[in-house]
Amino acid sequence: MKRRSVCVGDTVYVLAGNDKGKQGKVLSCLREKNKVVVEGINVRTKNIKRSQENPKGKRISIEAPIHVSNVRLSIEGAPAKISVKVTEKGRELWNKFPDGTSKLYRFVKERKG
């Protein structure tokens, strides 16, 4: 993600897929793949083979990553439009409202490297 507006701990709204319309908390960001893992969203069942620790085997549910373009930040329970402004201090994320006004949402520090 070159410009990331979604960080770990943010609440996001799912725009597309089987879980469209649901909200969840971001558990991790996979920057190199432009994907995020969201709590309770895109849950997949994985079968664990039998072993000495698990003589019967078992099935576990895990959250699979979804593309960052399929989620949007959720502010006050609704998906929010975010714009990025570059200032002397760094990048600022602004929440844009339908009436044309905007409000500072978060300041993003520049990553080195």
UniProtKB/Swiss-Prot annotation:
Keyword presence, rRNA-binding: yes
PROSITE patterns: RIBOSOMAL_L24 (PS01108)
GO BP annotations, alphabetical order: translation
Coiled-coil intervals, chain numbering: none
Record text on subunit structure and interactions: Part of the 50S ribosomal subunit.
Superkingdom assignment: Bacteria
Protein name according to UniProt: Large ribosomal subunit protein uL24
Keyword set includes RNA-binding: yes
Family: Belongs to the universal ribosomal protein uL24 family.
SUPFAM superfamilies: Translation proteins SH3-like domain
Function according to Swiss-Prot or TrEMBL: One of two assembly initiator proteins, it binds directly to the 5'-end of the 23S rRNA, where it nucleates assembly of the 50S subunit. One of the proteins that surrounds the polypeptide exit tunnel on the outside of the subunit.
Pfam families per record: KOW (PF00467), ribosomal_L24 (PF17136)
GO cellular component terms attached to this protein's record: ribonucleoprotein complex; ribosome
